[in-house]
Amino acid sequence: MKEYQITVLKGDGIGPEIVDQAIKVLNKTAEKFDFKVNYQEEYIGGAAIDATGEPLPQKTVDSCKASDAVILGAVGGPKWDSLSGSQRPEAGLLGIRGALGLYANLRPAVIF
């Protein structure tokens, strides 16, 4: 059975709620197509600021780089609007895109 490592970045605001549903869909897909998914949850955005004081902890970057895929939820919200640019939740999103060499959100789903 094929096995995949996925880093889960729930983000903040509505992100956790949406990501939880995406994981349910992925788990059903794994059952149907006979593959296994191992999840590693890390912080990004406002949730990371609240937990670690920074929008993109190095641990998150390292986990994403070691994974086969990343599930990313929404990032940002009024709670963090008073922070400076480099400390805002959105800095985590830009940082992870840069660290992974990405420039756009890709939404099509592919079964391997």
Residue ranges and their predicted role:
Residues 1-13, 31, 36-38, 43-112:
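Anion-binding alpha/beta catalytic cores of soluble intermediary-metabolism enzymes, centered on
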Residues 14-19:
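Short N-terminal binding/cap micro-motifs at the start of the first secondary-structure element
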Residues 20-23, 76:
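Short, function-defining helix-loop hinge/capping sites that tune catalysis or transport
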Residues 23-33:
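Short catalytic helix/loop segments, enriched in acidic residues and glycine
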